């Protein structure tokens, strides 16, 4: 990321006149204040293509993967929404069945609608003292999977908006026992890996796909998110295909 930022900074200071998008032409007079508009560019020589990364963006994503200890990591410029849509689409065939935590983000419901899925909902436990939804019960996950062998993936949100973390390791083991992947919406937990004071990231607990919103808890601009592919239970080829569909082209 340091190299990418430096290259953008250097290009912004150059005297190249941009006969390309975006329409502001890197002209700082277009916007009041100190917004670094000169670093806002399109796919030009030296800056790679996010959907077919071979250079500086591939290098940055590989560095991200090493930092989080994943099989592959991908940037999402459409927030965690694109990551969630991608993860579900790559894990469950159109019209298939999925086990979903009822307190999930609306992007999950959008994926269910778009892919015409048949969802089974698992409700979180209640924390009556705090008046909020609690974690997802491992035993309930196991029961639903035993009762319905046609379920193709499990999806939970951990941490929730209230900071509740489920037992990802045990839920992952339950899913894997039935030969299916666990998708974790970890949008609010991108910071977990950087301190022992935080819970352990789902990427380190056996989840197969983990989606994080860097802009929620890390110093990143709005919409910045990542999708971590952590195992071979979900096709990398399908992840790449659906990211290309759901992200801006």
What residue ranges belong to the model's regions?
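N-terminal "arm"/small-domain region of PLP-dependent enzymes with the aminotransferase-like
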Residues: 1-55
